[in-house]
């Protein structure tokens, strides 16, 4: 099992689940690993290449940081492969396990607009603090947020997307930049995951212009 990273709470849960399966099924040996961050592309690539060529494994579960690259790496593989979190568009992949990111984000965007209106915002604008730029999961969530916000009558500021590599600390820095650029406040901040949303909200705490801002997360650190 090769995850995007093992350095976040969300992925630690995934790791624990895989290891629990191995414990409950002693005839199946599961090895779980992951990159040190969601931008450690070369590190994950080396893991995948090494394990595919080792001959030591009968099946693979991969959460790709770069799905197009992994598609090339697994070409011609006959061992079963399952994609997790971000799909890999390749015939070698038997199944995909993950969230309907675009649809779920769209629902979140719609709910955020309604909450912003209820909070008293006349100008309902949304800015996104996203994950890793170019990542399929992050892109799907952005697309969904934009769709949901727009359909509910809000304005999604697409040109002001902040990319924070799915990391809470960077999300806080992005929020500082947003507050500097929008001193009068922004109605909605949509984030790639819950950890980022909480970090952004903490960064805005004490700023009266953001007292009624709606912060939207997605999932715990994913």
Where are these regions (language model features)?
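A residue-level marker of the well-folded mature domains of exported/periplasmic proteins
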Residues: 1-222
């Amino acid at each position: 099992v090769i995850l995007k990273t093992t350095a976040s709470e969300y992925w630690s849960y995934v790791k624990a689940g895989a290891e629990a399966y191995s414990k409950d099924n002693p005839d199946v040996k599961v090895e779980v690993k992951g990159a040190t961050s969601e931008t450690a592309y070369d590190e994950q690539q080396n893991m995948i290449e090494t394990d595919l060529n080792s001959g030591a494994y009968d099946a693979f579960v991969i959460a790709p940081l770069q799905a197009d690259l992994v598609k090339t790496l697994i070409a011609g593989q006959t061992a079963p492969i399952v994609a997790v979190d971000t799909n890999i568009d390749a015939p070698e992949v038997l199944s995909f396990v993950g969230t309907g990111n675009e649809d779920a984000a769209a629902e979140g965007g719609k709910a955020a607009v309604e909450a912003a209106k209820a909070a008293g915002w006349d100008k309902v604008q949304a800015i996104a603090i996203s994950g890793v730029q170019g990542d399929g999961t992050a892109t799907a969530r952005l697309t969904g947020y934009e769709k949901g916000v727009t359909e509910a009558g809000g304005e999604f500021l697409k040109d002001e997307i902040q990319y924070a590599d799915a990391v809470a600390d960077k999300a806080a820095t992005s929020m500082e930049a947003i507050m500097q650029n929008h001193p009068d406040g922004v109605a909605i901040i949509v984030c790639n995951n819950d950890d980022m949303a909480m970090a952004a909200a903490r960064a805005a705490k004490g700023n009266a212009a953001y007292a009624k801002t709606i912060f939207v997360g997605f999932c715990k650190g994913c």
